[in-house]
Amino acid sequence: MNKIVKTFQVAVFLTLGFIVTGYYLLSALNIILFLFLRDFVTISLSTDSMHGSKNPEKWDIRNLVKIGISVGAIQVVEMLILFFVGIRYLDLGNNIGVMNTFFHGDNFFFGLLTPIIVRENYFFWKSAPGRTLMVSIIGDMVVVSILSLFGFGMVAPVTLIDFVFILSYGLFMNLLVNDVFKVLLKKVGLSR
């Protein structure tokens, strides 16, 4: 389901961002960094500490896709809200490099937190992620944080205030709003 959510969210958000601004919200380097760093988390999912059921799992692929697209759609709306705030109040429209870094951080934090919420049928805190998964997520967050704040000639740095806003927004939206939304989808009959 993680793959469905991310593919939908990234494709739709970047397409809408380009249509609205005429600019790519992520540079080619941002996309390469995103894919490279996110792979560590994707690979570490195989070592997660989730316990399987006593009986063989029977997945309803149609429902998995519906849930994935629903969570992806709410993430697109949340990212569009952040886009509006960034352009309107944080003055990101004047510097393409800073805008790229801002949305790279946004996209990245949403991408890192999605496995945390979709790995569990109920609220994400019902079971702790495996050590390798958490180390991968935290390690990636540290790398992206350092790159976003300092740039090192690779990307345009964002301000500390902008960065804290991106991180706080991503944590709140994913670990609270999106997780509750996922549980509500289950309550209305959409489950794996």
Task: Give each language-model segment a name.
Residues 1-123, 147-151, 169:
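Membrane-embedded transport module
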Residues 87, 100-192:
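C-terminal transmembrane module of polytopic membrane proteins
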